[in-house]
Amino acid sequence: MLGRELRLRWRMCALRLLAISLGILLCTHFSAELRRRSGPPEKLVVAKVESTARDLNKRAEEMPSRRQVIYVRRSSSSSKAANPATNRRDNNKPIRWHIDLQPWASSSHSLDSEAIRFLRYITTTQIICSHRIKNGQTDQSVDASKPWTVCLDEKFNLAHQIRNKQCRVYSLGLGEDDNNFEVNMASRGCEVHRFDPSIASTQIHEGERLWHHRLSIDWRDPKPAIATHKLHITTKKLGTILNEFGHWKIDVLKADMESAEWKILENLILEGVVEQIGQLIFEIHLHWPGFEVSGNDSSVVRYWYSLFKELERKDFKLFYTYKDLSKPQRFLKKEIYNASSCYILSWVNTRWT
């Protein structure tokens, strides 16, 4: 009896020890699991968040800006041409919303000071051109009413482009009958596009190299809500037309826009289109401020001057200036400063060499 009782007690003790050992083992396992889950997960979560943030930032840097304006199709090649005349515009540049106004000519902000500075600027050439041709003609004895003048000095790109039959001319006008410049430039081998909203057909192909388009160049595109067929004429920005035509550059841009030239020139500067132009020939009108140019007389003249200084910053140099004495001699509706109401100015982009 005593032996049996001892064996039962031993078995009970063994079972208790086994239960205690099993409990200790389970507690140790659960404790280790809890430590593993409570420590590293925070690091894992933080690492994952940081990795996600880096991915998002990388994607944001790689995505093009929503505000970027693209007017020309992108080249499939990433390399840039050595000649500035064939370089594409940098579409990653930030958009400019206004030009940089020049400091006032004097502390008094007077019209006299602004007008004297401006008139001196437009009547003083900045670079010498030894080989100028007017209206596309070599014969300088021809008396042209409007001397649209280009520079064919060898140091500039236009002479080479004409020789290689690769030059392109854009002519902007409003019902102008005289197209001698366009015809003569086409006969020299240039591809000439004349934009005039007054022509009868949508497009007229004259000869081998001259196209007439029933389009009016504006400083803004028409609102999308306005249907095209409701417009009497089609108006577009020059950058939009470049994109639609697939043109990367313009060797010569001639413009006679009857006081719309100021806002058009501003648009070309702000959107970088002017950098794709080799030579500019503009007829400017000074008898009134121009379309959508506001402010008092001093502010208007300061704005005009600032536009031309913007061109100068882009390395455009004035090589020809013409004062039209056949037009009224008025400056902002006044007969002052011995100024004409109309001048023709020619610039060359000295980056195109």
From Swiss-Prot:
Catalytic activity, EC: 2.1.1.-
Keywords: Methyltransferase, Secreted, Signal, Transferase
Family: Belongs to the methyltransferase superfamily.
InterPro entries cross-referenced by the UniProt entry: Methyltranfer_dom (IPR025714), METTL24 (IPR026913)
Localization annotation: Secreted
Official protein name in the record: Probable methyltransferase-like protein 24
Pfam family, one: Methyltransf_22
Record's function text: Probable methyltransferase.
UniProt signal peptide: 1-27
Disulfide bridges in this chain: none
GO MF entries: methyltransferase activity
Region (Disordered): 73-92
Natural source organism: Xenopus tropicalis (Western clawed frog)
GO biological process, one term: methylation
GO cellular component, one term: extracellular region
Residue ranges, compositional bias (Polar residues): 74-86
